[in-house]
Amino acid sequence: MKPRICILRIEGTNCELETFLAFKRLGASAEIVHLKQLLGVVKERERRSLKDYNLLVIPGGFSSGDYIRAGAILAARIKGALGTEIADFIGDGNPILGICNGFQVLVEMGLLPGFGAPPEEREIEMQQAALTTNDSARFECRPTLIKHENKGNCVFTQGITKGCILKMPCAHAEGKFFIEEQKRERYLQLLEDNDQIVFRYVDPEGTYASYPWNPNGSLSNIAGICNPEGTILLSLIHISEPTRPY
């Protein structure tokens, strides 16, 4: 049976089609679903439930125009209206993928890094990290080199050799992974100890480097993380875009 994938969109999402096509090429059964369909505020035939899917994807874009902060409005809407459903979805062991704006949304929700609470309760956790304005203070859009750092915890990347360097596109203005100073050392160590770091920015030699190789100034060159269980992957890099034909 093909896995069923819910690709969530609202006003401002703009990468749902490339994400849909990427999963379609892999043989999955993917569907682009508007938030209103999950909230049940559409005609009955158009309504959807997270229970119908095996994977939730929040793709890239500028959800709700990224007003207030990138991903903040969509995070609040999901948390307020679908908190129980998200908790049940995670508690059942279903994976979640957040790409770029999806990364921003799920961090805003407090789901990741996910220290301290069982997975089914993390949607009510206090926010533990943030994605802030790039150090360059401008939108960064170009090919980027990332190194796969995970030792096998992340279910999404278990087929990628540790140390493999990938060339992927970045496109963001608020991509700097940030942890407040008083918690920074402890949280970064937890990310390492829990095998939660999935991707880091590198230069062509595979060495951690600053701008322009690190396009945003992310702490510890972090480009992607997962939850302690490895079932939720957040990638700032547009990992679905290279599958799109030109």
Predicted regions located by residue number:
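Cysteine-nucleophile active-site neighborhood
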Residues: 64-153
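Short, surface-exposed beta-strand/loop micro-motifs that present aromatic residues
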Residues: 221-227
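Hydrophobic anchor at the start of a short beta-strand
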Residues: 30-31, 96, 232
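Beta-strand-turn-beta hairpins that frame and shape the catalytic cleft
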Residues: 162-165, 227-232
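Single conserved hydrophobic/aromatic residue that forms the stacking wall/gate
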Residues: 237, 241-246
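Active-site-proximal beta-strand elements of phosphoester/diester hydrolases
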Residues: 5, 167-171, 233-236
